[in-house]
Design a protein with these regions (language model features):
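N-terminal "arm"/small-domain region of PLP-dependent enzymes with the aminotransferase-like
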Residues: 6-74, 203
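PLP-dependent enzyme catalytic core of the Aspartate aminotransferase-like
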Residues: 59, 63-67, 71, 94, ...
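Conserved N-terminal alpha-helix of the aminotransferase class I/II PLP-enzyme fold
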Residues: 63, 67-111
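Conserved PLP-anchoring active-site segment centered on the Schiff-base-forming lysine
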Residues: 118-137
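Active-site phosphate-binding strand-loop segment of PLP-dependent enzymes
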Residues: 151, 155-207
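Active-site C-terminal subdomain of aminotransferase-like
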Residues: 201-204, 211, 216-321
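Conserved PLP-binding catalytic core of the aspartate aminotransferase-like
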Residues: 297-306, 311-346, 356, 360-361, ...
Length: 395
């Protein structure tokens, strides 16, 4: 065995979970992505999706994707920088910039590539990137590629953020990069306070709206719009794989920043462009988001109903007010076991365990879609109560 394979063979955590019968990953879905899915011939309720508006199976979204394939084919066979820019891309960029309140935007092939390519290239060796300790992995990978000084602050802790800003040289660029809605715990960044500190220390702000878009703000414009700080935030990032029912991502900002990124963001320049189908699907989902605000209203009705149900049950969920609801278990193996038992009861949820979070912070991520019904939610709450009670997590 070569040294590389010998080293990698020592990683056996998945095999141990499989042997214990609690391995929860790569469950093969055999149906469309809706509130009910088929997995290994078993119908289960989906409470693990990021499709907050439930648009992945919407007829208009699918029709837009099919029409784009008929006109443009299945791919662009090149990067946006060269032969991969379609009129579809340009049109969507203009619409997204207007939607989030910025001058211009760039569409990337994935949301991960946005953060990777933007965070890594905006600041130089003498500059600073300041980030929340619970930022998404794509933000972390982005600043790892940067030559700037990286300063981490405690999650949503404004005193900690200010201490890090005080370490920075006043005349150097300081970029604060944060999730608008944090993807694991579902809590919201303290944007008004962050904006105030950014003004005090002459720092710039980039907000990842992956989980805020389609959920918060006017017609789902996101966390920045929700707090009324769009003009104070320098860059707004979004993804298509959640509320926009597709695959891809974008960054929106002023024209000067977007011009720089178009010519310097390596994950944009050296990646094949987003497919016609994915681009058109995202555009159609944006149309629906604007024309059917009742979807967001129903999503929030479900969210409040679920939060009340979990709190009345005695679940530990923290101070959460979004459709991403963390059910804290605080034990890796028990989290895996409960996910398995809930699946057997017909409920699909996602485990969040170390190293994604600290071992003492493991949780089950319960997420809602606008297409869920109260009846489906009642069934899930009852099943969760039964399983949690059997493990002494609730009374």
């Amino acid at each position: 065995m070569k040294l590389l394979q010998e080293k990698l063979s020592k990683y056996d955590a998945p095999q141990r979970a499989m042997a214990a019968g609690i391995y929860p990953y790569f469950r093969m879905i055999e149906s469309d992505q809706d509130t009910e899915v088929m997995i290994s011939g078993k119908k289960v309720l989906m409470f693990g999706s990021n499709a907050y508006l439930g648009l992945t199976n919407h007829p208009k979204v699918k029709e837009a994707a099919i029409d784009a394939i008929k006109k443009y084919g299945t791919g662009c066979a090149g990067s946006r920088f060269l032969n991969g820019t379609l009129d579809l891309h340009i049109q969507l960029e203009k619409r997204l910039a207007e939607f989030v309140g910025k001058e211009d935007a760039i569409v990337y092939s994935t949301g991960f590539q946005v953060n990777l390519g933007v965070v890594s290239c905006l600041t130089g060796r003498e500059d600073y990137i300041i980030w929340d300790e619970l930022d998404h992995a794509s933000i972390i990978e982005g600043h790892r590629l940067s030559f700037s000084t990286k300063l981490k602050y405690k999650h949503n802790d404004m005193e900690s953020l200010e201490k890090q800003l005080q370490k920075c040289e006043p005349d150097k660029v300081k970029l604060i990069v944060i999730d608008g809605v944090f993807s694991m715990e579902g809590d919201i960044a303290k944007l008004p306070e962050i904006v105030a500190l950014a003004k005090k220390y002459n720092a710039s702000i980039m907000v990842d709206e992956a989980h805020g878009l389609g959920v918060l703000g006017d017609h789902g414009r996101g966390t920045c719009n929700h707090f009324g700080v769009t003009d104070d935030v320098d860059l707004i990032m979004g993804t298509f794989s959640k509320s926009l029912a597709s695959i891809g991502g974008f960054i929106a900002s002023d024209k000067e920043t977007i011009n720089y990124l178009r010519h310097n963001s390596r994950s944009y320049i050296f990646s094949a462009s987003n497919t016609p189908a994915a681009t058109a699907a995202a555009g159609a989902a944006l149309d629906i988001m604007l024309s059917e605000p009742e979807r967001i209203e129903h999503l929030w009705k479900l969210t409040h109903y679920a939060l009340d149900g979990f709190r009345n049950m005695g679940c530990e969920i923290g101070h959460i007010s979004t459709p991403i609801i963390p059910l804290f278990i605080r034990n890796n193996d028990l989290t895996f076991l409960i996910v398995k038992e809930l699946f057997e009861a017909g409920i699909f949820v996602n485990p969040v365990v170390s190293p994604a979070v600290a071992p003492e912070d493991t949780l089950i991520r319960f997420s809602l879609m606008a297409t869920h019904t109260i009846e489906q939610l009642d069934y899930a709450l009852e099943a969760i109560h039964k399983v949690f009670k059997s493990h002494g997590l609730v009374k």
